[in-house]
């Protein structure tokens, strides 16, 4: 039974060839693309205002230079969101339940913010490793702690996404198996079916929220390491 539960997280193969790349390429078919037509599709008309409002909410705290990250961040959010939603379909594979893929997304994006921060503003970037007003005796210890916390950030991004999706898929698997086994008992099967329906709605919300949280934390790291709004750079009186 344990193997059956976790079998949904194994990478699918056909004739010995991995098919995970198909699952990762599938969201590209659902992304909005610009067309030369004057009349936009309903999907484009619905999705564009939503993405625009999310981008404004995430990038308005930054200055004009930080807005160049909007495209890659929104594309990454849509990529994660589509994979999460497609993974809720029956008999499908969810690549975002694999820690290797999530770390492959989190580490390069986080590392880009850190490296650019060290390149553009090395003094401000290194200042985050030592809080202001720290006693001299605690300086070495705090530098080590802040450095460790800095390198834990991409791990937290990947593990958070993996853990939330894996827990939800396992719970849906257990409830669906219980519903199938309890079919002869009508009253219990109805209750478990309603529970499965509510759990599916919850997982839809989790799929959307986790994609948004992933990019939200990335923009916060970007704002901290690279771009600071002009209002916070006012000279002292």
UniProtKB/Swiss-Prot annotation:
The keyword Transcription regulation does not apply. It catalyses: H(+)(in) = H(+)(out). GO terms for biological process: proton motive force-driven ATP synthesis; proton transmembrane transport. InterPro entries: ATP_synth_F0_asu, ATP_synth_F0_asu_AS, ATP_synth_F0_asu_bact/mt, F0_ATP_A_sf. Keywords: ATP synthesis, CF(0), Hydrogen ion transport, Ion transport, Membrane, Mitochondrion, Mitochondrion inner membrane, Transmembrane, Transmembrane helix, Transport. One of its GO terms (molecular function) is proton channel activity. It is a multi-pass membrane protein. The keyword Protein biosynthesis does not apply. PROSITE patterns: ATPASE_A. Signal peptide: none annotated. It is found in: Mitochondrion inner membrane. The chain crosses the membrane at residues 12-32, 69-89, 98-118, 137-157, 181-201, 202-222. Component of the ATP synthase complex composed at least of ATP5F1A/subunit alpha, ATP5F1B/subunit beta, ATP5MC1/subunit c (homooctomer), MT-ATP6/subunit a, MT-ATP8/subunit 8, ATP5ME/subunit e, ATP5MF/subunit f, ATP5MG/subunit g, ATP5MK/subunit k, ATP5MJ/subunit j, ATP5F1C/subunit gamma, ATP5F1D/subunit delta, ATP5F1E/subunit epsilon, ATP5PF/subunit F6, ATP5PB/subunit b, ATP5PD/subunit d, ATP5PO/subunit OSCP. Belongs to the ATPase A chain family. NCBIfam families: ATP_synt_6_or_A (TIGR01131). Subunit a, of the mitochondrial membrane ATP synthase complex (F(1)F(0) ATP synthase or Complex V) that produces ATP from ADP in the presence of a proton gradient across the membrane which is generated by electron transport complexes of the respiratory chain. ATP synthase complex consist of a soluble F(1) head domain - the catalytic core - and a membrane F(1) domain - the membrane proton channel. These two domains are linked by a central stalk rotating inside the F(1) region and a stationary peripheral stalk. This is ATP synthase F(0) complex subunit a.
